[in-house]
Structure formats: C-alpha cells, structure tokens
Amino acid sequence: MTERPHPPWDDSYTGGTPAPWDIGRPQPAFARLADEGRLTGRLLDAGCGTGENALLAASRGADVTGIDLAPTAIARAREKASARGLAARFEVADALDLGRLGLTVDTVIDSGVFHVFGDGDRARYVASLAAVLRPGGACYLMCFSDRQPGTFGPRRVRADELRAAFSDGWTVESVTADTFDINPVNGTTQAQAWLAVIRRG
C-alpha cells in the first residue's frame, strides 16, 4: 500500500505510557451498541488501535476486520485475538484508502478517527468509508466534541460539521452527546464526544 505522510501514530504505542485512548477495554458507547445487537455482520473497525472495540464485536459473532496505520497497535490486536480465541483479522492500512482492502462490509465503527482529519481529508475519509460500506449499511462514529473544555486532545468537532461531512449519499440518523473513557489527562478520565449513527444511502 502506498504510504502517505501521517503523524507518527506508531510512536503512541511504543512508549512507556499508554496513549490516552488506549484504555485496554472497549469504549462504553460501543459496549452499549454491542448489547443492542448493532455490531453485526461483516464489520470494519477503521482505526482500531489495539483492537478492543473490534474484539468485542467479534466476541458477539461479527465477522471483523480491524485496520490501523500503527504496526505496533496491529501486532497487539493480533496478540489479543489469539489469546482470546477470536477470529478477527487485523491489518496495517490507511483509513483514507479503504477501497484497497477489497472488502464490502455491513457495519463500520470509528472510535476517534474522524476527528484527526483536517477539512481536506474529511471528504476523502467519507468517500473511503463509502467504498467499503454496502448501501444501507451502518456507520457508528464517535468523535471529540466541541463541548470538551480545555485545549488537550484533537480538534473539536461540532455536530453540524459532522452532519455536513455526511450530507451527500448518507443519512445521519442521530448525533448524540456521549463521552470517551480515556487514560488520565490533566486529572480527567473522560472526554466529551459525539456518537453518530450514519447510514449509507
């Protein structure tokens, strides 16, 4: 796969301190979605990190592929899958070029990927999702919210920005306030988020 310039995401997994998002368990919002029976069928976790959300879906019977730019994260996700006896697949790949995977999936999950992209790459990312998600398929997307105070963390996203990004060929069914669980940053263990349910038209 052709490499593009990216932030050094692998560095987030090679230091002695876990990255804020690498909490060692699924995000509660995705655990709720799993409990509601929504993480089903052929499922892609775009930006899976060390795999906790993907492995949760696999444990509930989904046919899971997880991708991430960070080789160390993918290696850890594969180790977890093996240790837990789960058949999830994990690949080093670019979320901006998902069509190269040759997949068609029923469900996409995004836990903290959309908010890393600038304006130019947002449209590319949405097109990349459309390349793999079947018509009528669901995307469950969780991103940093403009309701988050302070300056730490990624770019804040407004709900209307999220809706605008998916205005062409998609139906945004809901955008609701939620929270990320995070490793402690400045004394806090949660960050304000939006959880969007988006269906491909």
Q: Which residue ranges define each predicted feature?
A:
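Conserved acidic residues
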Residues: 106
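Class I (Rossmann-like) S-adenosyl-L-methionine-dependent methyltransferase catalytic domain
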Residues: 2-44, 50-103, 117-132, 137-201
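Short catalytic micro-motifs in class I SAM-dependent methyltransferases
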Residues: 112-116
